Amino acid sequence: MATQRLTRQKWIDAGLDALILKGPPALAAEPLARDLGATKGSFYWHFKDVPALHEAVVKDWQSRALSQIAEALAKEGNSEKRLRRFGAQFVADKQDPAFRAWAHTSPMVADALSDVDQERLTYLVNLLNHLGVRNPAFAQSCLGALIGLPQLQGQTKPTQAFDTMVDLVLALK
């Protein structure tokens, strides 16, 4: 069993890891306790029930995702560099695909994902406006590409494919 007391945040982090590796069914007291070498009693000390864990995991992810957007807004660099950096960070994110899959079966997750995506779209619209692309539908196309590119099993890396899209936008200006 665990030799140190597990915090609520450690349970949430374990839930995030389990979601990425095993999917939503792994977000339950028993498998998480087993993974952490803890008892279910420790789980229930921090969470009323499994849905409370789900809510905490979703809120934690949403908070981190929104913080990443805020950090991106604060970072230096021209719009091109910022767009490329956003794309690279997005395709490297292992949590986003797991939450997208979970959103198909959970309205709570779907709502949180929608909120995060709306902020991402706002950020992309602003970046693209600075690059001379005024059609907000293109921001949606960019986000759609970033969501889908990691799913393709091609020879081109997702970041490289997104950078090619950015190159095309810059060439067409």
Residue ranges and their predicted role:
Residues 1-6:
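N-terminal intrinsically disordered/low-complexity leader segments
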Residues 8-10, 14, 18-52, 56:
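Helix-turn-helix
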Residues 12, 84, 121-125, 129, ...:
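An amphipathic alpha-helix signature
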Residues 56, 67-98:
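Hydrophobic alpha-helical connector segments
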Residues 57, 61, 65, 79, ...:
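Hydrophobic/aromatic residues within well-ordered alpha-helical segments
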Residues 66, 92-101, 107-140:
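Amphipathic alpha-helical packing segments from all-alpha helical-bundle domains
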Residues 86-90, 99-103, 142-149:
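Short alpha-helical scaffolding segments that buttress acidic/His motifs in well-ordered protein cores
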Residues 110-114, 129-173:
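Hydrophobic/aromatic-rich alpha-helical bundle segments in the mid-to-C-terminal region
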